[in-house]
Curated annotation (Swiss-Prot):
Its EC number is 3.6.5.3. InterPro entries: EF-Tu_GTP-bd, EF-Tu_GTPase, EFTu-like_2, EFTU_2, G_TR_CS, P-loop_NTPase, Small_GTP-bd, T_Tr_GTP-bd_dom. One of its GO terms (molecular function) is translation elongation factor activity. Belongs to the TRAFAC class translation factor GTPase superfamily. Classic translation factor GTPase family. EF-Tu/EF-1A subfamily. The gene is tuf1. It comes from Dechloromonas aromatica (strain RCB). Its main location: cytoplasm. Mg(2+) binds at residue 26. This is Elongation factor Tu. It comes from the Bacteria. Transmembrane segments: none annotated. Disulfide bonds: none annotated.
């Protein structure tokens, strides 16, 4: 059976489980891999294998995350599950595991709890585009009215944070029953219903190569007789030789023409997402471009200085600050390839931020950066990472 080959042709989607502690996220993850692998191939993962999540580092922050994969009839999924609440917060803010959609797991016996709410808010803040719900432990609730009540609460909660609560798929089931091979409605069939909902509710993500061109500037060289070469890794899209591009951020935006693309000292017709290239720019002086700017498709990204964000502040144990900070704190914000100083404004009623906290705050930079909602950044003091954040809403 040439199964492998077939798998690669399926669209790939990144998802993850979110929700309150002990509502069954890891059990559901195990149930999905077990039930779907029996039908579509792939590897079943046991609860203990997922729960013993390995450590990884993202933006200088240590996060425990378990990665599993599974297939449905139409797609290949990569799925992340985190053991602890703090890991979720860090994961979502650093974008260590970018999610095209999230499965919110909520125990039918308990209903929405504080972390249920917090994870929905985080999903909204960090720009997870789709959330669907698995109402777990339905075997523990005999009262149909109670199930309806929990479902209503969940829909209201989703709507409150600007998700389409009324249209969100909510699947009733029991991850444990499904894992045990139970064939009743809340057993294995609930996992297939969840798989169908994932396939139909989360659209195919737009591939990086199909998005508008953007390349963060890492270095600038002057090559006599040829002009100025800007190097970096293409983040998304394609740049073709002869195309007009913009240089955005730090200084006023300028337009230029890309007159050449080279990679490994060879000339190419184009550079695309994932390529490390040197782009030759027409009529641009070496001192007109600097690290921290981006090359992009004209009009696709604007420079901004003022925005709201969701940030996670490293704890002392993670090598972060030992003391809290207050309103007006002025660290550096590291966007893509460079640091920019900025000041922070805490939400009303918040006096200070302790190491280990996550919080929504407004940031004002002293120089504009090419920015979109969902852009990740690090917070640094003298080159040392003290936090991580994501742009939630641009103000100006």
């Amino acid at each position: 059976m040439a199964k492998e080959k077939f798998a690669r042709t399926k669209p790939h989607v990144n998802v993850g489980t979110i929700g309150h502690v002990d509502h069954g996220k890891t059990t559901l993850t195990a149930a999905i891999t077990t039930v779907l692998s029996a039908k579509f191939g792939g590897a079943a993962k046991k609860y203990d294998e997922i729960d013993a999540a390995p450590e990884e580092k993202a933006r200088g922050i240590t996060i425990n995350t378990a990665h599993v994969e599974y297939e449905t009839a139409n797609r290949h999924y990569a799925h992340v599950d985190c053991p602890g609440h703090a890991d979720y917060v860090k994961n979502m803010i650093t974008g260590a595991a970018q999610m095209d959609g999230a499965i919110l797991v909520c125990s039918a016996a308990d209903g929405p709890m504080p972390q249920t709410r917090e994870h929905i808010l985080l999903a909204r803040q960090v720009g997870v585009p789709y959330v669907l719900v698995f109402m777990n432990k339905c075997d523990m609730v005999d009262d149909a009215e109670l199930l309806e009540l929990v479902e209503m609460e969940l829909r209201e909660l989703l709507s409150k944070y600007d998700f389409p609560g009324d249209d969100t798929p909510i699947i009733h089931g029991s991850a444990l029953k499904a894992l045990e091979g139970d064939q009743s409605e809340i057993g294995e069939p609930s996992i297939f219903r969840l798989a169908d909902a994932l396939d139909s509710y989360i659209p195919d993500p737009e591939r990086a190569i199909d998005q508008p061109f953007l390349m963060p500037v890492e270095d600038v060289f002057s090559i006599s007789g040829r002009g100025t070469v800007v190097t970096g890794r293409v983040e998304r899209g394609i740049v073709k030789v002869g195309e007009e591009i913009e240089i955005v951020g730090i200084r006023p935006t300028v337009k230029t023409i890309c007159t050449g693309v080279e990679m490994f000292r060879k000339l190419l017709d184009q550079g695309q997402a994932g390529d490390n290239i040197g782009a030759l720019l027409r009529g641009t002086k070496r001192e007109d471009v600097e690290r921290g700017q981006v090359l992009c498709k004209p009009g696709s990204v604007k420079p901004h200085t003022h925005f709201t964000s969701e940030v996670y502040i490293l704890s002392k144990d993670e090598g972060g600050r030992h003391t809290p900070f207050f309103n007006g704190y002025r660290p550096q914000f590291y966007f893509r390839t460079t640091d920019v100083t900025g000041s922070i404004e805490l939400p009303e009623g918040t006096e200070m931020v302790m190491p280990g906290d996550n919080i929504a705050m407004t940031i004002k930079l002293i120089a504009p950066i090419a920015m979109e909602e969902g852009l990740r950044f690090a917070i640094r003091e003298g080159g040392r990472t003290v936090g991580a954040g994501v742009v939630a809403k641009i103000i100006e």
